[in-house]
Amino acid sequence: MKDSDNMIAKDEALRQIRLGLRRAAFLYHFFAKTLTDELGESQGRDLIRKAIDAYGEHIGREARRRADERGLSPTPENFESDLPTLAWEMERVVVDGEERVRVQQRPLAEEWLALGEPGKGRLYCFVDQAKMQGFNPDYEYVHTRNVLDGDPYCELVVRPVKRKVPESAS
């Protein structure tokens, strides 16, 4: 058997990835909806955030472990992307002097918008902050724009965390 016999076309790979992402979006949506329906909006949303934070921090710790194994420092440029690049159309842009990632194709958000509940979907986006917290808490992901907030695209930037300086005793 030739290697080419095991290859699939890029279009078919993308179709399959998007189908899997669509199902993941539905799964998240219906878990989130069930939690808020059963526990009430406030308690349900709190529990969703708790789960998303735990999930994201796990991903971040795994990325940190991989960076450590390769002898890399835990800086944003060494955080491995965990998104299938075929499914998310991203570009690097510079806005106000800082490098950001702008995402035009957002498979998960598109499903949540179609389901009519962008607010519950938006809670999932906090996974990015949790991933960086797990990878290196000295940095944070910031969503400067998000389609689930009504923006035309999603835009993210990684920034150093600003620590509050304790006031000295007088």
List PLM regions with ranges:
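N-terminal accessory segment detector
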Residues: 1-98, 107-124, 139-153, 160-170
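A short, contiguous, amphipathic alpha-helix enriched in charged residues
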Residues: 125-133
